[in-house]
Amino acid sequence: MDVDNGEGQVQVHLKTKQEHYAVPDVPYAIDGTVTTAELNTFVNALLLSKGSSAVDFDFLVFDEYLRGRLCDHLREKAISFEDAIEIEYVERFPAPEPQDCLLHDDWVSAVKASGKWILTGCYDNTLNIWTNKGKHILTIPGHTAPIKAVDWISLDDDTGRFVSSSQDQTAMLWQWNVGANTVECVSVCKGHERGVDSVSVSPDGQRFATGSWDTMLKVWSAELEDAGEGTSKRMKESGVRTPKITLQGHRESISAVQWMDASTLLTGSWDHTLKVWDLSLEGIKAEISTNKSIFDASYSKLNHLILTASADKNLRLYDSRTNQGSVVRNTYLGHNAWVQTVMWSTTEEFLFVSGSYDNQNKLWDCRSPKAPLYDLLGHGEKVLDIDWTNPKYIVSGGSDNTVRVFKSRKALVENMDTK
């Protein structure tokens, strides 16, 4: 076999974790030049003999998606062609479908979906609440500068509570009466000295954290009544809230903050670092140094990996659990301008989404560094924020004054979202 040209045959075992698509566990001799298309034909022919209908598969060879010829993939991994190769096949994740375009009056810099609602924040200083079917419910004034981040605290049929942060140096706590469709600002959270770019609510909904251009990380009570010590009677009466904890360690703006668990926070910064904070000790637990300013970061509770978005068009993957956290596990190539926003799926271990100044969203599998699974098109200008908190919807906001809503697989499979 002339392996230099990828000619001849390779012995492979075809495996799947989806038992209903399993084929006989025997070695198969296939041509070294096969691609995903030919492997699909081969596996479907085997399944057809079992009475199965045609299915689109993707193929993993040594934990990475096959994106070209098998022989080229093996050479790149320095795998001997004489070895029996295990190829795992998985049902291809279906392309998300565009559902809605929600028109705003200014740039949409913050989005967060929960249940049947979508919360947005804009550069005209307003918040907006929409249904996930595209109906506008409420416009909420209050901030005096562009809004940079939003997050839901709690939500049920009667009441919604959420937090917003802004370039006006504040975060604001809100309570929404769903039935009456009225909103009250519960507290104005003051303590930062520059704009507040990021906000994240704790898993139990009792606290939230903010990151700012003043380089500080602050933790606040998210309770309706802030009974903490040190809050003056005058501040309580005026609705002003002060932070419970202030943590210093970054040298430049904190662009991302996320709760990893009830007592651990992740931050990303323009100072090229990720930091993991232990709130019980009120200090830094771990630090990951990168070589680029971090515009956004996302931690997955499913796989414990961290993604970063940066100005060099690339996304990077880090492992927070190792002593070699600063070593890049993978780099994802596909955007043509700086990547502003990234988020892991909350239900699919390997999937994440990103949004970029190239006007595009992309859906990725972390095992496919060379290309995204899909481009999610629709924005006419820069993408500023993306959210996949609700497994049914990928939601993004942009400088084209729109929010784009895409149905994900969960919504497509359940067929619950016809207008």
From Swiss-Prot:
Give GO terms for biological process.
Answer: maturation of 5.8S rRNA from tricistronic rRNA transcript (SSU-rRNA, 5.8S rRNA, LSU-rRNA); maturation of LSU-rRNA from tricistronic rRNA transcript (SSU-rRNA, 5.8S rRNA, LSU-rRNA)
Against InterPro entries, the record matches this protein to: G-protein_beta_WD-40_rep (IPR020472), NLE (IPR012972), WD40/YVTN_repeat-like_dom_sf (IPR015943), WD40_repeat_CS (IPR019775), WD40_repeat_dom_sf (IPR036322), WD40_rpt (IPR001680), WDR12/Ytm1 (IPR028599)
| Lineage top rank: taxon | Eukaryota
Q: Where is this region: Ubiquitin-like (UBL) domain?
A: 10-91
* GO cellular component terms listed in the entry, alphabetical order: nucleoplasm; PeBoW complex; preribosome, large subunit precursor
Entry's Gene Ontology molecular function annotations: ribonucleoprotein complex binding
Localization annotation: Nucleus, Nucleolus; Nucleus, Nucleoplasm
Predominant location: nucleus
Q: Where are the WD repeats?
A: 103-141, 142-184, 191-230, 249-287, 289-328, 334-374, 378-416
Pfam families recorded: NLE (PF08154), WD40 (PF00400)
Name the UniProt key words of this record, in alphabetical order: Nucleus, Repeat, Ribosome biogenesis, rRNA processing, WD repeat
Q: What does this protein do?
A: Required for maturation of ribosomal RNAs and formation of the large ribosomal subunit.
Q: Which family does it belong to?
A: Belongs to the WD repeat WDR12/YTM1 family.
Q: This protein is called what?
A: Ribosome biogenesis protein WDR12 homolog
Organism encoding this protein: Drosophila persimilis
Classification from the root reads: Eukaryota, Metazoa, Ecdysozoa, Arthropoda, Hexapoda
